[in-house]
């Protein structure tokens, strides 16, 4: 191991550390960071070299953050990145600094929104918040209105998590939806992601995603928002149901096939009488 450490450059060490951090399971960033910190044994190198990994992790995970003085949480996503470590809260029309390591928001300041699309964004946000409140008890959503390639586009992001470290599991739901405001009909594109880590008596991760495409009738802001939420609700319900059914089937069939119910001898071992067995005597003599 010592020879391997001598062969690795600082750049290679940081690259490996960054990969560990980016792939940290939901709710376990601090644990992975602390482990990597011990392995690297160079705080300055870690902070400077792996800073991009801290940021990438928060962007990928849709990390929610509370801004002092404001009621609702906002998600850290690539769509809200306005540069120089600042992010947008479109609901409150502010931008703020975000510390990717401490996961803290500071210095909120007014920020001009895309006024031409704000009424559409607000309508979708109102409808989406009601949907998230009903379906995700711990859910957070952020809705952006942006011009992309000259087209007015709505981007809706949802995050919900359950961190149960005492019970040895953590999980996170993420979904991202986009549609462009065009006459008559718009294409809706979505991606749904589930990540769960269970680590009691083993180490198992569920990582799943699904791409969605649908069409949306565009009329006025309020009606379009209602139709959009119907698409979101149907797709997310179907995905979650399919995941549950799939893993129930695997539990009933696939997992059971991975092990014998009895040893090859077709006889269970009585561990209280292990010393009377030949293997017990061999262990005693060892």
UniProtKB/Swiss-Prot annotation:
User: Signal peptide position in this chain?
Assistant: none
Relate the protein's function as given in its record: F-actin-capping proteins bind in a Ca(2+)-independent manner to the fast growing ends of actin filaments (barbed end) thereby blocking the exchange of subunits at these ends. Unlike other capping proteins (such as gelsolin and severin), these proteins do not sever actin filaments.
In Swiss-Prot or TrEMBL terms, this protein is called F-actin-capping protein subunit alpha-2
Q: Which domain of life is it from?
A: Eukaryota
Q: Does the keyword Transmembrane apply?
A: no
Family according to the record? Belongs to the F-actin-capping protein alpha subunit family.
Under the subunit heading, UniProt states:
Component of the F-actin capping complex, composed of a heterodimer of an alpha and a beta subunit. Component of the WASH complex, composed of F-actin-capping protein subunit alpha (CAPZA1, CAPZA2 or CAPZA3), F-actin-capping protein subunit beta (CAPZB), WASHC1, WASHC2, WASHC3, WASHC4 and WASHC5. Interacts with RCSD1/CAPZIP.
Could you tell me which species this protein originates from? Carollia perspicillata (Seba's short-tailed bat)
């Amino acid at each position: 191991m010592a020879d391997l450490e001598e062969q690795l450059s600082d750049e290679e060490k940081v690259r490996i550390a960054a990969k560990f951090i980016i792939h940290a399971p939901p709710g376990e960033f601090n644990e992975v960071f602390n482990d990597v910190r011990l392995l690297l044994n160079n705080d300055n190198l870690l902070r400077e070299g792996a800073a991009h990994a801290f940021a990438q992790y928060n962007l990928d995970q849709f990390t929610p953050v509370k801004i002092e003085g404001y009621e609702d949480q906002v998600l850290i996503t690539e769509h809200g990145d306005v540069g120089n470590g600042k992010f947008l809260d479109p609901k409150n029309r502010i931008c703020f600094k975000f510390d990717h390591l401490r996961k803290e928001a500071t210095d909120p300041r007014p920020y001009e929104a895309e006024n031409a699309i704000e009424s559409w964004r607000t309508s979708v946000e109102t409808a989406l918040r009601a949907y998230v409140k009903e379906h995700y008890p711990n859910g957070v959503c952020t809705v952006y209105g942006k011009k992309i390639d000259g087209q007015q586009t709505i981007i809706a992001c949802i995050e919900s998590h359950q961190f149960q470290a005492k019970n040895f599991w953590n999980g996170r739901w993420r979904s991202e939806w986009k549609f462009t405001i065009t006459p008559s009909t718009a294409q809706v594109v979505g991606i749904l992601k589930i990540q769960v880590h269970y680590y009691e008596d083993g180490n198992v991760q569920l990582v799943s995603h699904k791409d969605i495409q649908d069409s949306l009738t565009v009329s006025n802001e309020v009606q379009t928002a209602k139709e959009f939420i119907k698409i979101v609700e149907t797709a997310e319900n179907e995905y979650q149901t399919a995941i549950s059914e799939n893993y129930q089937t695997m539990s009933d069939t696939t997992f059971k096939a991975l092990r014998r119910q009895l040893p090859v001898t077709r006889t269970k071992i009585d561990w209280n009488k292990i010393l009377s067995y030949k293997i017990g005597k061999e262990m005693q003599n060892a």
